[in-house]
């Protein structure tokens, strides 16, 4: 496919970095934001990248974006979501918190709480929350990934020993049929155990997750009680949420 040089360069930069904002691309190519928006719209229509509010990302169904890039993506939206999730958690509660940069933001937002018991397979979450003397933090055993996530059968077995008040979970994608999707089969198995052993499940998902592809199916959206997001989901997902009485919190 023959593309104009700037559009070809946009694709190469987005693939390398995972995500770029419109402002970054406008500065990079010395053009106006309106010009970049037109380029992004044309490339998205051809399926060459994914358009998001304020930027664009390279979308793969088999490989997630690098951890450091994910941590920078949708940072403001994740912070608002994290604060909203934390506001739903009372003091003296027991929690599961799974792998993800959004759940790490939630951990930081929980630091003003008191007397929480947290079970996690996320080393970054554990490091953040263990700083509070009145928090009890339990960490699953298993294989430690480079992003601080812990996976494997040992992690599943550990999680299954508990029954907690709340599961605070993130996800890589939500398909239009309501499927919750992720990239790592082993991570999904731990997340399934987390959901199965919580009384209430809160899914923190910024708007980039709606319609995003990933290769491993965790289960249907009916598994969760609440979805906390920065934007309403597409109509098909919204209908499924209403059908299964999944509450939507917008921030």
UniProtKB/Swiss-Prot annotation:
Species this protein is from: Pseudomonas aeruginosa (strain ATCC 15692 / DSM 22644 / CIP 104116 / JCM 14847 / LMG 12228 / 1C / PRS 101 / PAO1)
A GO MF term: ligand-modulated transcription factor activity
Record's protein name: Glycerol-3-phosphate regulon repressor
UniProt keyword annotations, A-Z: DNA-binding, Glycerol metabolism, Repressor, Transcription, Transcription regulation
SUPFAM superfamilies per record: NagB/RpiA/CoA transferase-like, Winged helix' DNA-binding domain
Boundaries of every HTH deoR-type domain copy: 3-58
TM regions (residue ranges): none
Function: Repressor of the glycerol-3-phosphate regulon.
Any single biological process term in GO: negative regulation of carbohydrate metabolic process
DNA-binding region: 20-39
InterPro entries, sorted: Carb_Metab_HTH_regulators, DeoR-like_C, DeoR_HTH, NagB/RpiA_transferase-like, Tscrpt_reg_HTH_DeoR_CS, WH-like_DNA-bd_sf, WH_DNA-bd_sf
Superkingdom to which the source organism belongs: Bacteria
